[in-house]
């Protein structure tokens, strides 16, 4: 049986904010949102 470190249920688990996963997600997500916004804005440019 795998033993797990037992926490008290009322004690919150500390999750670090800056992780490798967080950096990987945001380095992809931030430019993606920027480009989607730029492409959406281009649709309204009249020539």
UniProtKB/Swiss-Prot annotation:
In Pfam terms, one family for this protein is Cytochrom_B559
Give the keywords, sorted: Electron transport, Heme, Iron, Membrane, Metal-binding, Photosynthesis, Photosystem II, Thylakoid, Transmembrane, Transmembrane helix, Transport
Query: One cellular component GO annotation, for this chain's record?
Result: photosystem II reaction center
Q: Which GO biological process entries does UniProt record here? A: photosynthetic electron transport chain
Q: Give the bilayer topology.
A: Single-pass membrane protein
Family classification: Belongs to the PsbE/PsbF family.
In Swiss-Prot or TrEMBL terms, this protein is called: Cytochrome b559 subunit beta
Q: Which organism is it from?
A: Synechococcus sp. (strain JA-3-3Ab)
Q: Which gene encodes it?
A: psbF
